């Protein structure tokens, strides 16, 4: 409804990217593919630069990674997209990945593997449209951070955090883990 569409003419039918038939990989296959010994009790983090703000979100990314590190949350981190400042984001992610034994930074997973991972994760955290669009199809709770997805219709699986603080992250994690 961002462009003035009439609400009664909009029919939410799901994500077009989910129309592609895929075979779900087993947990064991994914562990081998990702080189992770135990793929349980984990979240998936996808955090992209915010291109329409002066602050690209790099400080938010650092705060988020610090909070997840401090609570020892096993986290599969996917590379950010290729927007402006994505190289800076990747460098921060690599730095945390090297210092934290509960972080697993991975490049392009491919759509089939990505969907399989969404089906196994406990929750997703970040600012990716994937959390708004695809995650609900897997009944995956999502913590959506910041303004990047403002204006998008979202499901009940999404918890929004506007102000990124450790306390807000903790509260949101408790909320999605109780779903």
What are these regions, as identified by a protein language model?
Residues 1-179:
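Nucleotide-activated sugar donor-binding and catalytic core shared by glycosyltransferases
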């Amino acid at each position: 409804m961002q462009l003035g569409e009439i609400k009664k003419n909009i029919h939410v039918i799901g994500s077009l990217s989910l129309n592609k038939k895929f075979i779900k990989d087993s947990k064991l296959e994914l562990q081998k593919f990702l080189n992770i010994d135990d793929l349980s009790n984990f979240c998936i983090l996808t955090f992209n630069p915010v291109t329409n703000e002066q602050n690209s979100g790099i400080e938010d990314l650092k705060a988020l990674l610090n909070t997840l590190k401090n609570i020892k949350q096993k986290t599969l981190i996917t590379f950010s997209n290729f927007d402006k400042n994505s190289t800076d984001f990747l460098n921060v992610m690599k730095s945390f990945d090297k210092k934290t034994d509960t972080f697993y930074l991975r490049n392009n997973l491919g759509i089939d593997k990505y969907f399989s991972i969404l089906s196994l994760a406990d929750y997703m955290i970040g600012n990716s449209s994937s959390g708004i669009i695809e995650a609900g199809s897997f009944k995956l709770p999502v913590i959506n951070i910041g303004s990047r997805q403002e204006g998008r219709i979202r499901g009940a699986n999404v918890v929004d955090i506007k102000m990124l603080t450790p306390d807000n992250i903790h509260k949101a994690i408790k909320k999605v883990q109780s779903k």
